[in-house]
Amino acid sequence: MQVAMVYRAFGKTGWRVSQIGLGCWQFGGAIMLDGQPDGWSGINDEESVATIKRAVELGINFFDTSDMYGWGHSEEVLGRALKEVGNRDRQY
């Protein structure tokens, strides 16, 4: 059984943003600090892209990312996935 996604108004922008968002920190992977990996590891880009695509299928259009997540790698992976989905203009 699939439940319909709930959307909320985003201020006065006219945007309808999914009530549930997807955090993208883990998609950035580990970064090197003092020669040691730090952060999330164990997920590859293909798994990340598949996860993002599934989130979009389920109605998620709100993604939390930062240039600090894998020194920008999370944003690159998110951009790639949304480009493949083909509706980047409706994602926030």
Segments and roles (model prediction):
Residues M1-Y92:
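N-terminal binding-site loop/beta-alpha segment at the start of enzyme catalytic domains
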